[in-house]
């Protein structure tokens, strides 16, 4: 990920990303990471406020600290300490969604992957082997999305 985008995330979410943290993925997943970071920050803040005012009903949530954010087997991996079962579920869902977004461009149309070699989710124009390219969406949906 470009250094400017990394700096932005670390500046906006200093509790989530330590100063020496480095992202090991491409720019296409920046917005996905931005939205995830916003949600995690909001959720932890709200839960902890509720735990203070209603301790009988809410448990505090330990601050999440990212340990590694990278691409692995074509999806985003977000390894961290802290959080709770809910934040783990949100992170798992983000991993799932990343498999439908081009890691390099952020495109969501005409995205797929190759079976041979390293697995990356890419726009069809960036595919290394066009003969082994597998779209994540079926042809009917790709046609609809291109025409709307």
Please identify what each model-predicted range represents.
Residues 144-148:
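Intrinsically disordered, low-complexity regulatory segments
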Residues 1-88:
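Long, charged N-terminal interaction/targeting segments
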Residues 102-105, 123:
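Short cysteine-rich clusters marking metal-coordination/redox-active sites
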Residues 97-101, 109, 116-119:
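Short metal-coordination and nucleic-acid-contact micro-motifs, chiefly zinc-binding Cys/His arrays
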Residues 107-113, 131:
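Short functional micro-motifs and their immediate structural scaffolds
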Residues 127-143:
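Short metal-binding segments enriched for Cys and/or His
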Residues 116-130:
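Cysteine-rich micro-motifs
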Residues 87-101, 135:
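Extended Gly/Ser/Thr-rich low-complexity repeat segments
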């Amino acid at each position: 990920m470009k250094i400017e985008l990394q700096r932005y995330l670390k500046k906006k979410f200093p509790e989530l990303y330590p100063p020496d943290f480095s992202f090991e993925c491409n720019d296409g997943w920046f917005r996905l990471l931005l939205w995830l970071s916003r949600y995690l920050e909001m959720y932890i803040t709200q839960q902890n406020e509720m735990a203070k005012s209603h301790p009988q009903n809410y448990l505090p949530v330990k601050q999440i600290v990212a340990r590694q954010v990278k691409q692995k087997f074509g999806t985003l991996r977000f390894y961290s300490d802290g959080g709770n079962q809910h934040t783990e579920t949100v992170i798992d869902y983000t991993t799932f969604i990343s498999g439908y977004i081009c890691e390099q461009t952020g495109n969501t149309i005409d995205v797929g992957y190759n079976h041979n070699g390293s697995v990356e989710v890419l726009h069809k124009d960036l595919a290394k082997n066009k003969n082994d390219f597998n779209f994540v969406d079926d042809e009917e949906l790709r046609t609809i999305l291109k025409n709307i």
